Amino acid sequence: MKTHQKIIPTLWIPLTGILTVNLLLNACAQTTLKDAFKKDFLVGGALNQAAFTGQNATAAAIARAQFDTISPENDLKWEHIHPQPDQYDFSAADQFVEFGQKNGMFIVGHTLIWHWQTPKWVFQDDQGKPVSRDVLLTRMHNHISTVVGRYKGKIGAWDVVNEALNEDGSLRDSPWKKIIGEDYLLKAYQFAHEADPQAELYYNDYTLENASKRAGAIALIKKLQSQGVHIAGVGLQGHYKMDWPSPAVLSETIEAFSAAGVKVMITELDMDVLPAATWSQAAEVSMNFKLQAKLNPYTKGLPDNVQQTLAKRYADLFTVLVQHRDTVSRVTFWGVTDGDSWLNNWPVRGRTAYPLLFNRDGSPKPAFNAVIQTSKEPQTPQKPM
């Protein structure tokens, strides 16, 4: 407490600095997320550059006070860290890792192999034509060995492959698959393990709660396991709706992956309270819909009744997660405050979204208190309906 008290008399602190100090002091006085669930699983957030560099003092303060694990929102993705064939830019990633280390956090690397946010040059030659299998494998190996090797012993786990499946559970026909073949996944995990044998390796995807895609993911994991790959866990991204998935379906999903021999993480958690722009539950980044007033109804704030519904939805979710604490190892929110959320600009750019536990000013929402409360209640396993 003394370190915080020394800051208070500094009268020239800007408004954001005052808010940060208040957040830090409040965090000392109330139960934090990481303390509430310390016997259950890690709790964290995805940080953007403004958060881990301190430019967004509010987000940085919340992260320090509330989280014991962090993921980078964008700064370890290929287009950011390896924009040109002979150019790596580790400046932001190094700061992210330093932030995590200074605050004693478990650091997750996101992501090594994805079909989005990967530069075109990775898949093309100088004439813009697709490269050969051998060339792409070499580029994959060099990238993974360089990035994972740089943070060996610092980043504890990696989302090695992200979003490799279609909604029916089949392999997505990505450039990786088209050029290398289905064994691109095997190679990616082998290269990552070679670069850091101690790091945990994960598969990460959205809508794994849906039966067909879940079955495809389990089949993929079992195939890789049979080939000698040790996948430590699967990431359910957790871009959830107010009516999807049900607690029973989430419970069923966790149990299915547990039976496959992997632990489960919720890796990109948010809860969209806004009207759906599409029937799809998929968090497909390519989706883009025109801004309409009916899709953006809460520009002046979230009504109390919606706040309470959101709080109950989060409480129901965390009740299931705590019930499955033996399988669930981590819950990571995709952002820190509502103002940080990607849902302000996806799938409709320019909306006012409210998907997280903290308001734009950094104050906790009713959903925060509802989540904390679930850690204090007796839990009994929930049977799938």
Task: Annotate the PLM regions.
Residues 12-26:
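Bacterial N-terminal signal peptides
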Residues 2-15:
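Bacterial N-terminal signal peptides that target proteins for export
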Residues 40-44, 69-71, 106-108, 155-159, ...:
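Structural preference for beta-strand elements that scaffold enzyme active sites
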Residues 117-121, 129, 150, 159-182, ...:
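Aromatic-rich peripheral "rim/lid" segments of glycoside hydrolase catalytic domains that contact
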Residues 46-57, 78-91, 165-170, 207-216, ...:
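Acidic-and-aromatic substrate-binding clefts and catalytic sites of carbohydrate-active enzymes
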Residues 65, 69-83, 92-209, 275:
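Substrate-binding cleft and catalytic face of glycoside hydrolase catalytic domains
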Residues 50-65, 138-147, 213-224, 314-320:
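Short, acidic/polar
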